[in-house]
Amino acid sequence: MSSQIHIRFVPYKKIDFIKWDNCITNAPNGLIYGYSYYLDHMARQWDALVLNDYEAVMPLTWNRKYGINYLYQPFLTAQLGVFGNRINAELLDAFLKAIPSRFRYWDFYLNHHNVHALKNFHLYQRKNYILDLDKHYEVLFKNYRENIQRNIRKADQLGCTPIKDFDVQKVIDLAIEQMRTNTKESSKNADQFIKLYKNLYSRQQAITYGILNAREELVASCVFIFSHNRAYYILAGNHPDGRTIGASHSLIDAFIKDHAGKKLLLDFEGSDIRNLAFFYSSFGASEEMYAGIKLNRLPFYLKWIKR
């Protein structure tokens, strides 16, 4: 990386997407959320900050409301921020200072290499959980907490069976049913994700997993997407009937069994929610911290809008 820090704002139409995606691919902290094709599907609008000749990049995902431009975190996009080599506090601070002033409100997450104490900005920390699958399955299974092992055996005894590579719409339906947010906005997000899934599936970067009960009903499901030696566990859904029979435990175990021994991290995408954090850690997963930032430069008479 050049010793000189020259960060420029690049509007979407002028981004060199080949150089952009190459930067994400080669970055030590590269994540699938940073690729242009991921952002194209999940962000309402996005522009960019670029260091020199795409040595480091930062997507600016934004929207407009009440005439105000604001930065936000897109649906199913857990971490963004600055991607590139040798990211330190000085560089991260410079990127944040380079965000155009027209973005008066910020509320977004950075990534696990962006956790620094900064001179000009306050970052807060969020928890993710990751599990290294580069071990024999028997070793991984022994590291599960006893209650996880017990629920997996229970699901097996009750006739639950894992399935994979089925219609992603079934995953979305179960997830939305669980979230109880079947709104116009959630439907739009779901439609965008279906398009993204088809794109990733064509690249062999996505697959659906599920658990059928003894009546062959789908009681747990999710999507796994792959990039940078990570498998991201997203859009998890759990039918009420599945919660009492260990369906979600069995689903995650099925994926681990299929991928044990590979150079792969299982990325649980969170969570700061205590019960979920305990659940993920019960599989032997460890904490990986990442950063978030909120900034409100709205006029005093508008600050209530984004509270």
Task: Describe the function of each predicted region.
Residues 64-79:
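Conserved acyl-donor/pantetheine-binding loop and adjacent beta-alpha core of acyl/acetyltransferases
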Residues 4-53, 58-67, 111-243:
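A conserved beta-strand-loop-helix scaffold within acyl/acetyltransferase catalytic domains
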Residues 44-46, 101-105, 206, 261-263:
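Short, high-confidence coil segments that cap the C-terminus of an alpha-helix
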Residues 90-97, 199-304:
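Aromatic (often tryptophan-rich) hydrophobic motifs at membrane interfaces
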Residues 49-50, 104-110, 266-268:
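Short, hydrophobic beta-strand segments that form beta-sheet elements in well-ordered domains
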Residues 89-127:
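Non-catalytic accessory segments adjacent to catalytic cores
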Residues 78-86:
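The substrate-binding groove and active-site-proximal loops of carbohydrate-active enzymes
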Residues 1-14, 18, 288, 300-307:
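Short, Lys/Arg-enriched, disordered terminal segments
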